[in-house]
Regions:
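A metal-dependent, Asp-based hydrolase signature
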Residues: 67-105
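Boundary at the C-terminal end of the N-terminal hydrophobic targeting segment
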Residues: 16-18
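Asp-based, Mg2+/Mn2+-dependent phosphohydrolase catalytic module
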Residues: 22-24, 121, 125, 141-142, ...
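Active-site neighborhood of HAD-like aspartate-dependent phosphohydrolases
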Residues: 20-64
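Positively charged n-region of N-terminal signal peptides that target proteins for export
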Residues: 1-4
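Short, acidic loop-to-helix structural element flanking the phosphoryl-transfer center
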Residues: 80-81, 100-136, 146
């Protein structure tokens, strides 16, 4: 009995899927920070904020916060628009002079030119070769994510691209995950979300999906939410886990 318990603990630590957990048919991917490296924007955002490198994370969290304000007030704006507005807010609250044109220049072009993390292409290729349907599910606009994938060389890996622009509800609104499931023609049990954000994992799990947290630098899980099925450091690591 002790041996069996020990094996179960080992499997759990390795992220090995339980036998009664169905293999996902569709894998949804968050985009910004999960697949694409936001650090490349640091120089333009830092310059716009008067050299304040420490305000980069505040800007991104402010952008996410106000996307949820749009959900609540039902006044949808694109992620790029919210990003510009959030940068202006952070600048004003820290007494940095910044015009709307300067904020847009610091965000829009760099956001559409983010490079993929080093592990991404190999991981996506392995998952695609294993037969999984790969779909991006992003808070970015339809045109925005298309341009991002073109510039990052990721277009060919995905079977489809879904944007919250079509439902006008930002993640982690449960309706967004439910809409994605209906659009993909699968049940929650047949789908998995991969994300580097605790709030996205929380939303996916609450909607009934399987979830994998990819631990990008500085990213942590929300401890009060349902736990992800897996926690990995790279996409090839996830591909190995799912290759049962």
């Amino acid at each position: 009995m002790r041996f069996i318990m020990a094996l179960m603990l080992v499997f759990a630590s390795l992220g090995v899927q339980a036998k009664d957990t169905p293999q996902p048919e569709v894998i949804f991917f968050d985009v910004n920070e999960t697949l694409l490296d936001l650090n490349s924007m640091r120089s333009s955002v830092t310059e716009a904020l008067g050299g304040r490198d420490d305000l980069m994370s505040l800007w991104f969290s402010t952008m996410l916060h106000h996307s949820l304000v749009d959900n609540t007030t039902r006044r949808f704006h694109t992620f790029g628009e919210i990003g510009v507005a959030s940068l202006l807010m952070v600048a004003e609250s820290n007494e940095v002079e910044l015009s709307e044109a300067e904020a847009r220049q610091a965000i829009v072009t760099p956001l559409r030119s983010l490079p993929p993390h080093p592990d991404v292409k190999a991981g996506l290729q392995a998952l695609k070769e294993a037969g999984f349907t790969l779909i991006s599910l992003t808070n970015s606009s339809n045109q925005g994510v298309k341009t991002q994938f073109e510039n990052a060389g990721l277009l060919s890996y995905f079977d489809a691209r879904y944007s919250v622009e079509d439902i006008q509800r930002y993640k982690p609104d449960l309706r967004t995950y439910q809409w994605a499931l209906e659009k993909a023609g699968v049940t929650a049990e047949e789908a998995m979300l991969v994300a580097a954000h605790g709030w996205d994992i929380a939303g996916a799990k609450a909607a009934g999906l399987q979830a994998t947290f990819i631990a990008r630098e500085g990213k942590v899980l929300y401890p009060l939410a349902l736990k992800p099925d897996y926690k990995v450091n790279t996409l090839p690591e996830l591909a190995k886990i799912l290759a049962r």
